[in-house]
From Swiss-Prot:
GO terms for biological process: negative regulation of cell population proliferation; negative regulation of DNA-templated transcription; negative regulation of transcription by RNA polymerase II; Notch signaling pathway; protein phosphorylation; regulation of cell cycle; regulation of transcription by RNA polymerase II; synaptic vesicle clustering. Changing E295A: Strongly reduces E1A binding. Changing C134A: Strongly reduces E1A binding. Residues 1-70 are annotated as: Interaction with GLIS2 1. One of its GO terms (cellular component) is GABA-ergic synapse. The record marks N375, G376, G387, V388, H409, G410 as: Cleavage. This is C-terminal-binding protein 1.
Length: 440
């Protein structure tokens, strides 16, 4: 539906037509953009939407049918949607990030185009906090390097050998941990760190006064104060235009000599060239990164490839089986609220409400646009081909398409699952609250 279609309907530019979801209308199409398993989402959406997946590794791999017909999209952090990408979607009304961070979506442009963007702000708080403490403890106690020494055949028996291989290991009690961004994950990290004996400072210009008293923490008023007084600095803020490369050559020089750095938030917060140089010079004693400027991360390239005393993990601090299921369920429920309610009024976690041009019901759409028999199907390249993945498809739709086929060949009929009831219902780092949490 181009702008001419909208004008013919008497709607202003940027306001997308409502989409009907009723017994006489096809179900709206919802697509998982960068994944292939929709078994968690299907039970929540199957009676109100057609669910498909793209398994796209880049926006160029999003199928034309999804671009033309999808009214809802689910996505992880592995692809980025710019304004140019968003303009390719002809019927899209809502995007839900399966996770808390949404810096991979241009939320202002989405709002200008009439597309609501939502997230799951409480996702993986415990997992990310636990992973952060794991990295911090690893830096202090050097477990990774000790393990590596044994794997490499290093003989460790005498006190002198232990002293040599464990060089740099330090006592934790009495050390000062500086937390940048005291949202959900930042607070969870603070409570865990106190149990290990850390003195905890935090810097968060967005947080109202009083939290430090409730949690027994010390608040500092500037980033410079935190960097100067911290033995270990950990980042727990969202990425925005104000804090890109928050840790850079200038701020590294404001840190204590030999401090540690941990980042499980967003890769863009750290200038990796500056970090690599600081590690080589010993200004930073060690660093642990779960997120990187360029992902997927590889040790074989980039500025960190030769950096010493560095631990890297592949953006997995958020993950546990339980957390993954919980965030997917909540993301699907948000899509359901959009379909059965009003955008943005019915949405629980809309992050671009201020940018949306209007709040409208989902309503009518040409019946030919959506194919309800494709619940669970895969929209994958090459263009013009629709297939069903051999795994990850719910039993209700498994095997409905034996192999990939041309769209021009038509689609095999399949019985819909019965309707089911709804399931139960300034360098200023932006902290991980509802509007921007520690990132997944």
């Amino acid at each position: 539906m181009g702008s001419s279609h909208l004008l013919n309907k008497g709607l202003p530019l940027g306001v997308r037509p409502p989409i009907m979801n009723g017994p006489l209308h096809p179900r709206p199409l919802v697509a998982l953009l960068d994944g292939r398993d929709c078994t968690v989402e299907m039970p929540i959406l199957k009676d109100v939407a057609t669910v498909a997946f793209c398994d796209a590794q880049s926006t160029q791999e999003i199928h034309e049918k999804v671009l033309n017909e999808a009214v809802g999209a689910l996505m992880y952090h592995t692809i980025t949607l710019t304004r140019e990408d968003l303009e390719k979607f002809k019927a899209l009304r809502i995007i839900v990030r399966i996770g808390s961070g949404f810096d991979n979506i241009d939320i202002k442009s989405a709002g200008d185009l009439g597309i609501a963007v939502c997230n799951v702000p409480a996702a993986s708080v415990e997992e990310t906090a636990d992973s952060t403490l794991c990295h911090i403890l690893n830096l202090y106690r050097r477990a990774t390097w000790l393990h590596q020494a044994l794997r490499e055949g290093t003989r460790v028996q005498s006190v002198e050998q232990i002293r040599e291989v464990a060089s740099g290991a330090a006592r934790i009690r009495g050390e000062t941990l500086g937390i940048i961004g005291l949202g959900r994950v930042g607070q969870a990290v603070a409570l865990r760190a106190k149990a290990f004996g850390f003195n905890v400072l935090f810097y968060d210009p967005y947080l109202s006064d009083g939290v430090e008293r409730a949690l027994g923490l010390q608040r500092v008023s500037t980033l410079q104060d935190l960097l100067f007084h911290s033995d270990c600095v950990t980042l727990h803020c969202g990425l925005n235009e104000h804090n890109h490369h928050l840790i850079n050559d200038f701020t590294v020089k404001q840190m204590r000599q030999g401090a540690f750095l941990v980042n499980t938030a967003r890769g863009g917060l750290v200038d990796e060239k500056a970090l690599a140089q600081a590690l080589k010079e010993g200004r930073i004693r060690g660093a642990a990164l779960d997120v990187h400027e360029s992902e997927p991360f590889s040790f074989s390239q980039g500025p960190l490839k030769d950096a010493p005393n560095l631990i890297c993990t592949p953006h997995a601090a958020w993950y546990s089986e339980q957390a993954s299921i919980e965030m997917r369920e909540e993301a699907a429920r948000e899509i359901r609220r959009a379909i059965t309610g009003r955008i943005p009024d019915s949405l629980k976690n809309c992050v671009n409400k201020d940018h949306l041009t209007a709040a409208t019901h989902w309503a009518s759409m040409d019946p030919a646009v959506v194919h309800p028999e494709l619940n669970g199907a895969a929209y994958r390249y090459p263009p013009g081909v629709v297939g069903v993945a051999p795994t990850g498809i719910p039993a209700a739709v498994e095997g409905i398409v034996p192999s990939a086929m041309s769209l021009s060949h038509g689609l095999p009929p399949v019985a819909h699952p019965p309707h089911a009831p709804s399931p139960g219902q300034t360098v200023k780092p932006e902290a991980d609250r509802d509007h921007a949490s520690d990132q997944l």
